[in-house]
């Protein structure tokens, strides 16, 4: 297996009730940037998505976001990231993220995060868990 160049992160559009979740997202963004690994995520500037993206940028990393047009119109996109891909639907967002990322990390989130993570497990059939 070659070097990992990009990692997708599925996580919540809210920070949640446990401050440790935001700390973990921040640390993940920092570690990815320090390792020279591009972050691929849902393109939002809010919630854990925003935390991980801003941490990667702050640490000198490259960040690619993929966001559906309807969320762009709601002004939740982070337009200050390295590159932002606008797609037509949530389904297309997931497809593009799978194309752009070599692997995925799943952080806390809601039903969308659960759906994305389950799809990843089914498609790639490989996973590891860390505590």
Briefly describe each language-model feature range.
Residues 50-55, 116-127:
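Short Gly/Thr/Asp-enriched flexible loops that form oxyanion-binding sites at enzyme active sites
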Residues 17-20, 111-118:
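Glycine/threonine-rich flexible loop motifs
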Residues 1-100:
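A cross-family phosphate/adenosyl-ligand binding-site feature
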Residues 104:
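Hydrophobic acceptor-binding patch used for acceptor engagement in glycosyltransferases
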